[in-house]
Amino acid sequence: MAGQPLRRPAWVPLLLRLLLAGIAACDASPADDSAGPGGRGPRGRARGDAGADEAVPRHDSSYGTFASEFYDLRYLSEEGYPFPTAPPVDPFAKIKVEDCGRTKGCFRYGKPGCNAETCDYFLSYRMIGADVEFELSADTDGWVAVGFSSDKKMGGDDVMACVHDDNGRVRIQHFYNVGQWAKEVQRNPARDEEGVFENNRVTCRFKRPVNVPRDETIVDLHLSWYYLFAWGPAIQGAITRHDIDSPPASERVVSIYKYEDIFMPSAAYQTFSSPFCLLLIVALTFYLLMGTP
């Protein structure tokens, strides 16, 4: 037995060929995009097949594709609207004149017995915590305002105005009177603002702090002031001169802690209430009586 060469089993060459074939198959994996013409694409279509690239959609931007598909399928309704419509805005709560003199103070200017919807001008105020809530309404399509004055005259006054603009909105703005002109002040103390233009009337509601940092354009409402009442037209959302030459004002200073319901007749209803007219009537009556035989 010694001296004879060792023989390899017959199955060894076969095993080597199988191993080499397996290595070659791994180098040309079906998942490899670099496979040759005999390989297969990512969808299993042979690279050599006609129209292979056209049939397999490519996603160059996975995020962009996801976003567009998500938007198209999730947010577009059958009618083609991208988003559901927003819920309607709460309507403007009607001003309650029955609370005047009880839980809030009111000023009415116009026809006797008028209310917030029929007076030429209407103002109410009430305390809510550290704020004062104001409600204003006037027979105008422009603006309505209240001024806080120390002398019942225009000039150097703190003014809050509700202005109806060309877009149909009512905005609350802060002004400072310089003589007969109102200059808008960017520092606006108003909050919780709401307003509406209906039936040719501008109506609004807002709150303002009672105490504010010292500023010549903003007064402290815990002090008593004369209230100036004004309204007039607006051009492209900018206020113009008020409707009457001498706007009405409170007869005395107003305290926000005292609630009264004060009526002031407009000029059309002052004919027989002014002292001059009453004196004229008395004189005419006396003359007629004396002249009667």
UniProtKB/Swiss-Prot annotation:
Expressed in the brain (at protein level). In embryos expression is evident in the ventral forebrain, but a lower level is seen in the remainder of the embryos. In the adult brain, expressed in the cortex, cerebellum, hippocampus and basal ganglia. Its main location: membrane. It comes from Mus musculus (Mouse). The chain crosses the membrane at residues 271-291. It comes from the Eukaryota. This is DOMON domain-containing protein FRRS1L. InterPro entries: DOMON_domain, FRRS1L. Residues 46-60 have a biased composition (Basic and acidic residues). It is found in: Cell membrane; Synapse. One of its GO terms (cellular component) is postsynapse.
